[in-house]
Each structure stands twice: as structure tokens, then as C-alpha cells.
Curated annotation (Swiss-Prot):
Cysteine disulfide links: none
GO cellular component, one term: Knl1/Spc105 complex
Location within or outside the cell: Nucleus; Chromosome, Centromere, Kinetochore
Source organism per UniProt: Lachancea thermotolerans (strain ATCC 56472 / CBS 6340 / NRRL Y-8284) (Yeast)
Name of this protein: Outer kinetochore KNL1 complex subunit KRE28
Record keyword Cell division present: no
Signal peptide: none
A Pfam short name: Kre28
Name of encoding gene: KRE28
Domain of life: Eukaryota
Quaternary structure (record): Component of the KNL1/SPC105 complex composed of SPC105 and KRE28. Part of the ten-subunit outer kinetochore KMN network that includes the KNL1, MIS12 and NDC80 complexes.
Length: 362
């Protein structure tokens, strides 16, 4: 896997989408399977109830030792026709029974002499009217409901089919995305290899640039050496002054009042700096009152600051904390910050921030 944040992010998003699509597909298949099982169970119960209600119509038949699958479809059609006939007969009998039970008194049946009897004719006309109007209307409504049910069932079936196709298409798209992601990783690796090879070729084909870089490095080393020599001389002077002060304190000779006052002033000055201007990220703070300079270390970089009448007049940077190709820009940035004329503490903070932008040592 290429260590590219874009590719890694795409892979995470693709895996999450694939897991979500898989969960939805499994849920849809489970719902469809449950629906089919319920339909089969309902049909089974209906057939069993139909057989039980019409058991007298069926005669026992000796089952053959082997079942011929080719006759199943014909038997299903016969059973469907028989079911429709039974429904029709049952409805006719129930309708006639209810009609005779609630419309004609049992005492009047025996008094009907013939079909030409006025009462029979009246009832016949009423039945015909009921059949022509109400029953036809009800049959039409029933047919419409059946048609609506068929349409709704077909719509549900179409939606399930579309859902299955969508799940399958989503899986195919996920596979294509994985393939494209692999191709992107391969292209990224190839590009990185080409860039590295090109960088090597450029380095090999440009000895002048290498020589210039070596010269810049040597120049920086010389500046660093000069800085260290100046620092060493300052330390030697400080050591000599301290030895003189200690010799004056511990000896029996007359005390040098000027040296003692200078030491006390120097010590008070250092303490004042530490309490007022020191940033917590500054290390190895040293103050040189005679030369109006102070220096400290931050992230492997020695920072030498020269003070003038209006604040910081110059900032020098030395050390290995800043790469050679960035040292010139870093020196320019810190001196621009120093020239803004802000308070000393704020200027030091801004200089430290600029050093952070260029250093490689944390």
C-alpha cells in the first residue's frame, strides 16, 4: 500500500461504502426470503383448509411407487379449476340459502302453486334486479380490487428485482473501485520511482550545482567557526573577569571597588533579563553587556542578537538546526521581524517562531 494520504482516504471510504452496501443487500435478501416463506406457508394452509372442507369430494387413490414430475403442472391446473368451481358452488349455495332464509317465510313456501305465481314472479324480478344492479356492481368492484392487488404485487416484484440489480451493480462498482485504486497506487509508485530516477539523473548531470552546494556548505562552516571563535573569546574574557573578582574576594589585598560594582551590575542585568525577556523555549542564555549582544540556543540553532539604540539591530543564526538550503531565507526572515521595532520580548517571540518554520530539529 502506498503511503499516500489521498489513496489511504479513498480506500477507507471505499471499504466503508462496501460494508454498508453489503449490509443493505443482506437485509434485502433476508426480507425477501421471509416474504416468500410466508407466502408459501399461507398457500399451504389455504390448500389444507380447502381439502379439509371438501374432503368428501376426493376419493382415495393409490399412490404410485414413483412420482412422475411431468404430471405436476397438469395436476396443479386441475386443482386450480376445481378450486374455482368449489368457490363458485359455495357462493351460489350460500347466497341462495341466505336469500331464502331472510326473504321468504317458511309458511309461505308451501302456498306457492307454480312459477307463474305473482309472489314468485315478484321475488324473481327482485332477484334479477339485484343481480343486474348490485351484484354486477359488486363484481366490478371486486374485479377492480383484484386488478389493483395484481398491480401492487407486480410493482413490489419489480421493486425487489430493481433492488437486487442495484445490489449486484453496487458490488460490481465496488470491485471496479478496488481495481482503480490498485491502478492508482501502481501509478503513484511508478511516478515516485520516475521522480527519484530523474532526481538522480539531474544530480549526476549537474556537477556545477553540486560544486556550488559544497561551496555554500563550506562557507557556512567557516561562518560557524568564526562565530565559535568569537564566542570562545567572550567566554575567556568572562572567565578572566570572574577569576579577578574571586581573587579580590578571597585575597587579603585591597578590594577593587570598580570590579565588584561591575560584577554586581552584570549579575543584576542577567537576572533582569531572565525575569522580563526570557522565553521558556530559549536555552543557554548568555548576555554580553560590553558588546551589546546576547545569545541563546533554540532547536539546535545558535541565535546571536545585537542590540542598538532602538532595539534589535541584527540577528545572526548558526548551527545545524536549519538546513543549508534554508539558512539564507531564515536569516532574512528573522532580521525582517527584528526590524519591525516592536517591544523586545515580542520581537524575541517572533524570531523564535520564524526559526521554528525553518528548523528540522524539534
Amino acid at each position: 500500500m502506498a503511503d499516500d494520504p489521498t489513496i489511504n482516504g479513498l480506500e477507507l471510504q471505499l471499504n466503508a461504502a462496501e460494508e454498508h452496501a453489503t449490509a443493505l443487500t443482506e437485509e434485502a435478501l433476508q426480507n425477501q426470503d421471509l416474504h416468500y416463506k410466508e407466502v408459501v406457508e399461507q398457500l399451504k394452509r389455504s390448500v389444507e383448509q380447502l381439502v379439509e372442507d371438501n374432503e368428501s369430494l376426493f376419493t382415495a387413490v393409490d399412490l404410485p411407487p414413483e412420482v412422475d414430475p411431468t404430471c405436476i403442472s397438469g395436476r396443479i391446473l386441475d386443482l386450480a379449476q376445481l378450486t374455482q368451481q368449489l368457490k363458485s358452488t359455495h357462493l351460489q349455495q350460500e347466497t341462495l340459502d341466505n336469500f331464502l332464509r331472510y326473504t321468504i317465510s317458511s309458511t309461505d313456501i308451501l302456498q306457492l302453486e307454480s312459477e307463474s305465481d305473482e309472489r314468485y314472479a315478484s321475488v324473481s324480478r327482485a332477484v334479477s334486479q339485484l343481480q343486474d344492479n348490485d351484484i354486477i356492481q359488486l363484481d366490478s368492484e371486486v374485479d377492480q380490487i383484484k386488478q389493483d392487488i395484481r398491480k401492487a404485487g407486480q410493482t413490489i416484484a419489480d421493486q425487489r428485482e430493481a433492488l437486487n440489480e442495484l445490489c449486484l451493480e453496487t458490488g460490481n462498482l465496488a470491485d471496479e473501485c478496488h481495481t482503480l485504486l490498485s491502478e492508482l497506487e501502481e501509478a503513484t509508485r511508478t511516478r515516485e520511482m520516475v521522480e527519484k530516477q530523474a532526481a538522480v539523473e539531474v544530480t549526476n548531470d549537474h556537477p556545477v550545482e553540486e560544486m556550488y552546494a559544497s561551496w555554500q556548505s563550506l562557507k557556512e562552516e567557516l561562518q560557524q567557526e568564526s562565530h565559535l571563535r568569537r564566542h570562545l573569546n567572550q567566554l575567556k574574557q568572562s572567565k578572566a573577569s570572574l577569576e579577578a573578582i574571586l581573587g579580590t574576594k578571597n585575597g587579603n589585598e585591597h578590594k577593587d571597588t570598580n570590579v565588584m560594582q561591575e560584577y554586581a551590575s552584570y549579575d543584576a542585568f542577567i537576572r533582569f533579563w531572565i525575569s522580563k525577556f526570557t522565553n521558556k523555549e530559549m536555552e543557554n542564555l548568555e548576555v554580553f553587556p560590553r558588546s551589546n549582544k546576547f545569545q541563546f540556543t533554540h532547536r539546535g540553532t545558535d541565535v546571536v542578537i545585537s542590540l542598538g539604540p532602538r532595539g534589535i539591530s541584527r540577528v545572526e543564526l548558526y548551527g545545524k538546526g536549519i538546513p543549508l538550503e534554508k539558512i539564507a531565507a531564515a536569516r532574512k526572515d528573522v532580521n525582517e521581524e527584528a526590524s519591525r521595532g516592536e517591544e523586545l520580548y515580542m520581537s524575541i517571540n517572533r524570531i523564535i517562531d520564524k526559526i521554528k518554520e525553518h528548523t528540522t530539529v524539534s
